[in-house]
């Protein structure tokens, strides 16, 4: 089993457990260059809010888009957008990535901005 298939297996297992909770899901995806966050409805088929380093307003505020500083900016942005929609409690879906580095920075920033998970 290679590294990617192991990560996808972990992600599938976590998503199965989160779907049983019937809670809003904060989904993270990261690439070497960017980080993305989406808020998904409990039904699983509707994206309620999104933030990423691809967006022009976030790209102008950070020096580089592939580091922890950029992840903090995305975490704050997704939390603000979720609270605008009236969502304060979410389930954190790290997509099989380690809770370390950019993923942890995004999660901590979202918590500081008011999201609970």
From Swiss-Prot:
Cellular component GO terms, alphabetical: cytosolic large ribosomal subunit
Listed NCBIfam families: L18_bact
Keywords per UniProt: Ribonucleoprotein, Ribosomal protein, RNA-binding, rRNA-binding
One GO BP annotation of this record: translation
Protein name according to UniProt: Large ribosomal subunit protein uL18
Pfam families noted in UniProt: Ribosomal_L18p
Protein purpose: This is one of the proteins that bind and probably mediate the attachment of the 5S RNA into the large ribosomal subunit, where it forms part of the central protuberance.
InterPro entries, per database record: Ribosomal_uL18_bac-type, Ribosomal_uL18_bac/euk
Organism: Pseudoalteromonas atlantica (strain T6c / ATCC BAA-1087)
Gene3D superfamilies documented for this protein: 3.30.420.100
Family: Belongs to the universal ribosomal protein uL18 family.
HAMAP family: Ribosomal_uL18_B
Top-level lineage group: Bacteria
Complex formation: Part of the 50S ribosomal subunit; part of the 5S rRNA/L5/L18/L25 subcomplex. Contacts the 5S and 23S rRNAs.
Recorded GO MF terms: 5S rRNA binding; structural constituent of ribosome
